[in-house]
Amino acid sequence: MCGIVGYTGPQSASHPLIEGLRRLEYRGYDSAGIALGTPGKLFIQKKAGKLSNLENSLDESLPVVHSGIGHTRWATHGGPTDGNAHPHVDNEGKLAVIHNGIIENYTELRSQLEAKGHKFSSETDTESVAHLLSDLRKEHNGDLTAAMRDAVKALRGSFTLLAIHADAPDVIVGVRRNSPLVVGLGDGENFMASDVAAFIEFTKRAIELGQDEVVTMTPTSVEITDLDGKPVKPKQYEISWDASAAQKGGFAHFMLKEIFEQPKAVADTLIGRLSDNNQIVLDELHMSTEEIRSLKKITVIACGSAYHAGMVAKYAIEKWAKIPVDVEIASEFRYRDPIIDPSTLIIAISQSGETMDTLMAVRHAKAAGGRVLAICNTNSSTIPRESDAVLYTHAGPEIAVASTKALLTQIIAVYLIGLHLGQVNGSLKDSEVRDLYKELLELPGKIEQILETVEPLRELTRTFAQNNTVLFLGRNIGYPVALEGALKLKELAYIHAEGFAGGELKHGPIALIDQGTPVIAILPAGHEHALDEKMPSNIQEVKARGARVIVIAEEGAHVEGAEHVIRIPIAPALFQPVLATVPLQVFAYEMAVVRGNDVDQPRNLAKSVTVE
């Protein structure tokens, strides 16, 4: 959620710090600040609001120093004010701390520190860490690294911390517990950040940090220890994408760019997944034929849009592999004593690999004896590292808060898993797998067809921009599409939007319909259970009560009672979510633009939710 950057090296530190924070804006924030390593007393500047407020406050008198830390805050403890913004400092103004996460025992720490004479100036949990570190550093004769190790032992919660002290301004110390932190290795300069996007302009060499590992960074060295001070061998890797992938590339917004990148993202996730003898290739699962055939249940855990991908997984895997599938909201999963045993496969879906609710559910599942397969878009993130296996999607960096291409690649990933499991356990013939895979390979081109005809949809959006309620209806595989359409509209347009299963309409939701209420219906096609006849009845029901009906339907499908029809290419029924979701993304995007909202950084939201 919060964005964290640290820099030490030959550059004027304000430049990599501000640029790094700019590249982390997608994470969501409501204030920003920096601490520069000026000798004697740190230079601190922080402002509520956008990063531009901070930039505008930095005048020509800004000191030219070569180390510092920067932060974008997403408020949890205390409102979004200048005083609550990070960095937070000790009473001497010599030690500064930035923090992502939550310190659960901060009130207890604050009381103890105030009793010792420390003066607090904010409402945050973070300020307690600054004062605690100040005391511990003195106990360790100025050793900030040793102080950090002891501080972490005293803290409860999930967090990433970075600290700097004016007496050794070129040294930055960091630690992570259940929250992301990565080190960037430069030439005579080094970086720390919550995401590699912050420093990819400067280096593509990175180090992944493990749980409770403390990193001490200077311009020419990076040392990592555990909480007992024992050295840890760094795990270096090369970042696979470049800085241009985190630029808008001529599009008005990152979200629009990412919508148009979906054909390539889907194609990249599919490439090379069928062998010459028509076998789905998923070596990453690390499961033998016997282990797959012994599976009795699959549980999918996810949050937000990824949860909707999980719902699609249920339809696909049960259809193809004949294995029962439960789909759980990750934040609820571990609080009800779920039944898990070695015959249970847990599929954890997370774009960032750092979603805290999903990570906690993964740990609970593993402790209960389940095998965990992660579906993730971010290499070397925490959830893949703690899972038994990982299937990486190939969406590339997704900067906009609202998920688009990451969601579609997650759906493609669950299709591949379903086909593989069904093929191995004998529920699908090789010829069936071959034919379905060929249909999957046609999806990128079909998405392009949809994107080539979005202009009428943009015009349509303007006629609905002033409505304050929009309802979405779907049946079977169209139900998660309806939920996703409603979520996107809530996130981006700040409109009350709800998705319902069509069969539930008469059980309450129809009471919401009045004159002029927009209703978007996803018309099923090609289903085995006569669903094609059910949704038209729902359309007539809402139209009779004054609704303005928009229908998403396949080319050639007969539609009655709709004010507007959005056509999508023909595809097998289970693959329709990949296509039907795209016009709903465009609809939500255009609604946000017309209403003047911040498309890439919607209010109150964060890209990667790293607190519970």
Report each predicted region and the residues it spans.
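Conserved short alpha-helical segments that host acidic/polar catalytic motifs at enzyme active sites
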Residues: M1-H253, E261-K296, Y335, E448-L451, ...
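A SIS-like phosphosugar-recognition module
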Residues: I44, D167-A168, R177-L181, D187-G188, ...
